[in-house]
């Protein structure tokens, strides 16, 4: 029989079968079903396939034994059906290239294929509906091939619908009606299948194959989720709901076979996508929310979806935590990404009402998630990893995460507290992590970023800065810190104080001061002694020494009187070796009966040190001890000046006058030690200005004029300003007035026009103090020689901002600066400090070259000539011939460089 004859014969048979009654189908089932299945396997026609499938499902399936459906029907029909459906998809993709409104033949072909696909899906829907109707509790073994084959067809249909714009290009409108039907039928089939699978019960003692089938179903639905995520929100959510429900329902049986990492990753991706959509909608809501506002209703719908996903993640994490070790990094990143879009400099601009709604509906669920993960060592490892290179926008979220975790630790068992509070080669402790990441939030600290404060009894919630937020929570944590972990607390605080990041160091100092107040007096005294020894042993001048000295100064104010006496005895002011320490101590910290004797003793020892230097060879190397003595005297004057009698004040003033005679202008510019001595002398002279000899004042002003012209370092200029502002208290006699006043005007003018904004600010402050106090009003207008200077002074006095910058522009600038300065400052090692530039340059033997002195002499002369030219350019217009001459000089320098290189 030919193929055509066979098709005709089968058509006759199918036509005959379609007219059978229900009773006849039941009776003839054993003989007819094998024949139908044979026809189904042999047929090459889609139409015939669909007719046979429809007859089997509608007429014979109701009479089959539900316990043998797998063997008698599904295992024989489904593989061929899948092949048929995949073939239809391939042909659709191929034919779609030729689709056009003019090509009616292709239109008909494509529409017929789509209708055939819908009919295939309808046939499988009938299978699922029948199983659901006949079995209250489904045994998975009796339908084991049905779920996987159906899910394959559903996914293929959804993928085709999702890619339809690409497949059909600009001709989608010709088939869009059938694509909608295809999507709805696949949607309906999946709902029917999920209803069927919901009745499945897995017994741990049954065949392991059943568990694998359920695992395969969950993973297939996971793939479908990724396809439909942007197509239908409700359907997407329902699919996820089923995945989570079945995963937890059969958890005891399938927990070890599930791809937990993939489930968590997909769920986190959907959370982020929904949250991003929610924020975009929130940005569009400019008017107060109203029930009739379509944008607001869509925002609420998306926010509920975010909450649903977060709840799903919360439930899944709770049950499957032991299997989530390789998902902890994903969960960590989820928390950071969400908060980066809500709180950081990169956050979306939404109204306060929307922010509160998002926080109360969605963000609130992240807190119990962290509670669940708190005991997980892999999560701790992920959060506190030493090599965690986070981008700028995730630094603030990292700080907030660590603060949330820290707040929860006091209620946790000691082993959990220890887990978070210890560190090793691969991870930091939580305290170290907070301090480090806090230091990276320069942009948020400078704006500053505000966070929601905690509510007190009867008090409204007040926004607080990031600094306040972290500091308060750190102090609360310290108050509840387990005693066995105190050594780690001390180490973390000290490490942070020694940080080169100013914000980190100040935060650690504030926490340490809280500890000094909260802890025992004995603990406070121990810490003061510890820091004092560190200050004494710290070499050279470095930021770490500055930080330690500030901490020491603050801690002393919390020291009990008996311990203050012990401190004075341990670090006696009578010993010159202790002067290095006392220069950093404010005597205001001591009780009044201790302050005066300490002040007098320090001044006596310092005067002796100054006399010793005056009677020595006065080398640069010996300036170290002199500077220390001067620094101590300045500290005493500023913190306990009233404790000194007139005799001591006079003696100090005399020493200052003698020391001033050794000031050398050239060394001020080139030698750091001389710069420090010069600055200290100026500040001390400013303190004693009422008793300083007028001739000495004239000499000082004359030196200052020369120094300012050479553009000294900023710290020297600041000392100059201290001295200048003090002159406002002084009446300058006629004998030196003509020398002093014009010089003062020149100095102030030079510093006001300085391009350094900090120096300019201090100059304006010094000028204001001088102008308000001086009896020589005629000098004030002389200092305001140009319109630019007048405007700066007026703006300063009126407290007006020099630049009116929009909030958005300010945030953008801060983000840009944060990106530029994101790399943390390099740590200063002890060796670097020992050989720091603050020390005078060490002399060493050198090889004498022929004509070397001549080379040096000529080069110094050339350098001085260039400095003079630079000075002239800053105070006058350049002549026309200067630029060509400089270019010619540049050419000669290049020629000389080539001569040096070639020898």
Curated annotation (Swiss-Prot):
One of its GO terms (cellular component) is nucleus. Pfam families: DUF4487. The modification N6-acetyllysine is found at residue 843. It is found in: Chromosome, Centromere, Kinetochore; Nucleus; Chromosome, Centromere; Midbody. InterPro entries: DUF4487 (IPR027902). GO terms for biological process: chromosome segregation; interstrand cross-link repair; mitotic cell cycle. The modification Phosphoserine is found at residues 101, 795. Phosphorylation at Ser-101 by PLK1 strengthens FIRRM-PLK1 interaction. Phosphorylation at Ser-795 by PLK1 negatively regulates its interaction with PPP1CC. One of its GO terms (molecular function) is protein kinase binding. It comes from the Eukaryota. Keywords: Acetylation, Centromere, Chromosome, Cytoplasm, Cytoskeleton, Kinetochore, Nucleus, Phosphoprotein. Regulates PLK1 kinase activity at kinetochores and promotes faithful chromosome segregation in prometaphase by bridging kinase and phosphatase activities. Phosphorylation of FIRRM by PLK1 negatively regulates its interaction with the phosphatase, PPP1CC, thus creating a negative feedback loop for maintaining proper PLK1 kinase activity during mitosis. In complex with FIGL1 may regulate homologous recombination. Interacts (via its N-terminal region) with PLK1; controls PLK1 kinase activity. Interacts (via the KVVXF motif) with PPP1CC; controls PLK1 kinase activity. Interacts with FIGNL1; may regulate homologous recombination. This is FIGNL1-interacting regulator of recombination and mitosis. It comes from Mus musculus.
């Amino acid at each position: 029989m030919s193929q055509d004859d066979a098709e005709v014969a089968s058509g006759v048979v199918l036509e005959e079968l379609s007219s059978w009654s229900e009773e006849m189908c039941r009776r003839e089932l054993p003989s007819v079903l094998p024949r139908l299945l044979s026809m189904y396997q042999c047929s090459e026609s889609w139409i015939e396939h669909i007719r046979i499938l429809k007859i089997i499902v509608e007429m014979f399936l109701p009479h089959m034994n539900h316990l043998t459906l797998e063997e008698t029907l599904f295992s024989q029909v489904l593989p061929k059906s899948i092949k048929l459906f995949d073939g239809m998809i391939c042909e659709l993709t191929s034919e779609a290239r030729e689709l056009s409104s003019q090509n009616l033949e292709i239109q008909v072909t494509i529409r017929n294929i789509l209708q055939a696909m819908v009919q295939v899906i309808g046939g499988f829907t009938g299978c699922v509906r029948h199983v659901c109707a006949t079995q209250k509790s489904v045994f998975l073994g009796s339908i084991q091939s049905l779920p996987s084959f159906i899910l394959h067809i559903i996914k293929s249909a959804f993928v085709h619908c999702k890619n339809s714009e690409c497949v059909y290009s600009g001709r989608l409108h010709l088939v869009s009606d059938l694509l909608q039907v295809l999507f709805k039928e696949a949607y309906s089939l999946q709902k029917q299948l999920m209803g069927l699978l919901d009745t499945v019960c897995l017994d741990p003692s049954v065949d392991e194959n059943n568990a694998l089938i359920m695992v395969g179903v969950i993973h297939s639905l996971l793939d479908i989720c990724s396809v439909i995520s942007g197509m239908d929100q409700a359907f997407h959510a329902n699919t996820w709901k089923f995945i989570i429900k079945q995963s937890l329902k059969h958890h005891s049986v399938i927990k070890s076979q599930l791809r937990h990492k993939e489930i968590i990753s997909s769920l986190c991706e959907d959370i982020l996508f929904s949250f991003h959509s929610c924020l975009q909608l929130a940005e569009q809501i400019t008017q107060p929310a109203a029930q009739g506002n379509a944008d607001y209703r869509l925002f609420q719908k998306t926010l509920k979806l975010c909450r649903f996903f977060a709840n799903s993640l919360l439930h899944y994490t709770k049950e499957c935590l032991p299997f989530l070790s390789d998902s902890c990094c994903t969960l960590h990143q989820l928390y950071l990404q969400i908060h980066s879009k809500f709180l950081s400099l990169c956050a979306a601009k939404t109204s306060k009402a929307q922010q509160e709604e998002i926080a109360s509906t969605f963000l609130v669920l992240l807190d119990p998630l962290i509670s669940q993960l708190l005991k997980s060592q892999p999560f701790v490892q992920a959060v506190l990893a030493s090599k965690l290179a986070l981008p700028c926008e995730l630094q603030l979220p990292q700080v907030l995460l660590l603060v949330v975790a820290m707040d929860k630790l006091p209620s946790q068992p000691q082993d959990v507290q220890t887990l978070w509070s210890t560190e090793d080669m691969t991870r930091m402790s939580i305290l170290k992590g907070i301090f480090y990441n806090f230091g990276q939030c320069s942009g948020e600290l400078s704006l500053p970023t505000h966070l929601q404060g905690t509510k007190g009894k009867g008090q409204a919630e007040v926004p607080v800065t990031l600094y306040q937020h972290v500091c308060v929570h750190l102090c609360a944590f310290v108050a509840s810190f387990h005693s066995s972990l105190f050594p780690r607390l001390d180490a973390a605080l000290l490490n942070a104080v020694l940080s080169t990041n100013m914000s980190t160091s100040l935060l650690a100092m504030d926490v340490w001061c809280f500890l000094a107040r909260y802890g025992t007096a004995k603990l406070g005294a121990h810490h003061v002694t510890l820091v004092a020894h560190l200050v004494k042993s710290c070499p050279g001048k470095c930021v770490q020494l500055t930080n330690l000295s500030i901490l020491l100064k603050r801690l002393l104010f919390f020291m009990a009187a008996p311990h203050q006496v012990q401190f004075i005895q341990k670090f006696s002011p009578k010993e010159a070796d202790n002067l290095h320490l006392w220069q950093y101590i404010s005597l205001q910290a001591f009780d009044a009966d201790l302050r005066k004797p300490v002040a007098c003793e320090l001044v006596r020892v310092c005067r002796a040190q100054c006399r010793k230097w005056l009677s020595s060879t006065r080398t640069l190397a010996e300036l170290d001890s002199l500077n220390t003595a001067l620094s101590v005297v300045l500290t005493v004057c500023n913190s306990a000046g009233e404790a000194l009698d007139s005799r001591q004040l006079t003696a100090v003033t005399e020493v200052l006058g003698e020391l001033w005679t050794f000031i050398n202008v050239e060394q001020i510019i080139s030698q750091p030690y001389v710069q420090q001595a010069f600055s200290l002398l100026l500040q001390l002279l400013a303190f004693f200005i009422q008793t300083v000899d007028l001739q000495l004042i004239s000499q000082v002003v004359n030196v200052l004029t020369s120094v300012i012209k050479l553009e000294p370092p900023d710290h020297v200029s600041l000392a100059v300003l201290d001295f200048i502002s003090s002159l406002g208290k002084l009446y300058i006699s006629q004998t030196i007035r003509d020398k002093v006043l014009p010089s003062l005007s020149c100095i102030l003018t030079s510093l006001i026009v300085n391009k350094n904004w900090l120096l300019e600010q201090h100059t304006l402050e010094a000028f204001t103090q001088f102008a308000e106090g001086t009896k020589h009003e005629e000098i004030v207008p002389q200092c305001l020689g140009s319109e630019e200077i007048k405007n700066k002074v007026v703006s300063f006095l009126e407290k007006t901002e020099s630049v009116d910058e929009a909030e958005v522009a300010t945030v953008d600038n801060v983000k840009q600066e944060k990106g530029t300065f994101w790399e943390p400052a390099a740590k200063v090692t002890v060796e670097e400090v020992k050989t720091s530039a603050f020390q005078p340059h060490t002399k060493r033997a050198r090889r004498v070259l022929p004509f070397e002195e001549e080379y040096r002499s000529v080069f110094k002369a050339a350098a001085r000539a260039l400095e003079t030219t630079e000075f002239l350019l800053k105070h006058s217009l350049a002549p026309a011939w200067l630029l060509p001459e400089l270019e010619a000089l540049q050419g000669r320098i290049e020629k000389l460089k080539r001569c040096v290189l070639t020898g």
